[in-house]
């Protein structure tokens, strides 16, 4: 029994070592930051909630079930306020139902990392840079039945985070991605003390090529 436990322990250590060699660094993580108060207050839960103007980030398929013909939303989110005071996420959303079953939507997210001072030496004149990223989205959702809808979204991403240094360029990186989403909403049901609905959803997000900051490859 001790030999088996020792062998299993060795296998776990080997797997952990290999995992450390394959560290994956996710690019443009600002896409995962909640841009609306409701979803942020619900632990980033927005895929299967009721429709609102911010559905573009979480599940654009929800727009087909909107009771409003169109909607507009604007938000500003300070980020890491306990550490710095100039990092923020701004977001603009708009959707328009073209009929009872289909809807177009678009959004713009802008993430600013504030001002960063670069110095060659302690007494040198600082070089102030303002790294930032943005994403522009466009989606279309369509009801496939009275209770289920799907959506596709395209996204252009531009990231200007690379800080210039001697002998290296600091060009912005850009890429594109797309989402495939679905949403189900039941009929209103009478429960013991209230009327409610069942909702479910999925969203495969940011499918596409890797973003590359190295312009030499």
Residue ranges of predicted features:
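Sec/Tat signal peptide C-region and signal peptidase I cleavage site
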Residues: 15-19
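Positively charged n-region of N-terminal signal peptides that target proteins for export
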Residues: 1-4, 146
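Sec-dependent N-terminal signal peptides
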Residues: 4-13
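Subset of outer-membrane beta-barrel
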Residues: 20-217
